[in-house]
Amino acid sequence: MSFTRRKFVLGMGTVIFFTGSASSLLANTRQEKEVRYAMIHDESRCNGCNICARACRKTNHVPAQGSRLSIAHIPVTDNDNETQYHFFRQSCQHCEDAPCIDVCPTGASWRDEQGIVRVEKSQCIGCSYCIGACPYQVRYLNPVTKVADKCDFCAESRLAKGFPPICVSACPEHALIFGREDSPEIQAWLQQNKYYQYQLPGAGKPHLYRRFGQHLIKKENV
């Protein structure tokens, strides 16, 4: 895969933009001989409404004190009339070599055969080691069940029933695409679009792909 090593800093992370053919990605995926799921967030389509996050909260019974998913509104430029925002999805990246898995003392944090990083609730002892180890800070301790929770692509609530993650179905702007990483839809999108991946130190390769986009929002008169 060809890529432009143009980087910018979002917090303490590194962003690398990729362009061109995704054929090498497809080849690597086939060599693994595993079904790997991936998600695409098209920031050029996202309007920052957070309908996806609200749908996630309802479907997965996320308490008010926790969050599996949110869309951060990052101001880029600002003037008297309008602000330019970058709408950035904050959720588990299902990264390879995930530090949350490495630190879990009971094996409750694990990766399934589809590449989804999950939490086995019956094995979680609520020690919060995984929460502290996650560089993206996208895990939380459920105050009711006392177990760690995070985005798992709706593995039990939706995928097991043959439905895509609720955030994908709920998005009014069709800014989210989900499927097998080697599927024609995902591969075609990666071939046809310039995208990036956001990776923090200490974490492996993410399985969340992003198309960069910014939006000018006019300020209302007060």
UniProtKB/Swiss-Prot annotation:
Q: Does the keyword Amino-acid biosynthesis apply?
A: no
Q: Which residues does the annotation say bind [4Fe-4S] cluster 4?
A: 104, 124, 127, 130
Q: Is Cytoplasm a UniProt keyword of this protein?
A: no
SUPFAM superfamilies recorded: 4Fe-4S ferredoxins (SSF54862)
Give the induction text.
Up-regulated by the oxygen-responsive transcription factor FNR under anaerobic conditions. Repressed in the presence of nitrate or nitrite via the two-component systems NarXL and NarPQ, respectively.
Which residues of the sequence carry a binding annotation for [4Fe-4S] cluster 1? 46, 49, 52, 171
Q: Which Pfam families does the record cross-reference, listed alphabetically?
A: Fer4_11
Source domain of life: Bacteria
User: What does the entry list as the binding residues for [4Fe-4S] cluster 2?
Assistant: 56, 151, 154, 167
Q: Name one GO cellular component term.
A: outer membrane-bounded periplasmic space
> Which of this chain's residues are annotated to bind [4Fe-4S] cluster 3?
92, 95, 100, 134
Q: Provide the alphabetized UniProt keywords.
A: 4Fe-4S, Iron, Iron-sulfur, Metal-binding, Repeat, Signal
Domain 4Fe-4S ferredoxin-type, residue spans: 37-67, 83-114, 115-144
Q: Name one GO molecular function term.
A: metal ion binding
Signal peptide span? 1-27
UniProt PTM: Exported by the Tat system. The position of the signal peptide cleavage has not been experimentally proven. Can also be exported by the Sec system.
Write down what this protein is called.
Uncharacterized ferredoxin-like protein YdhX
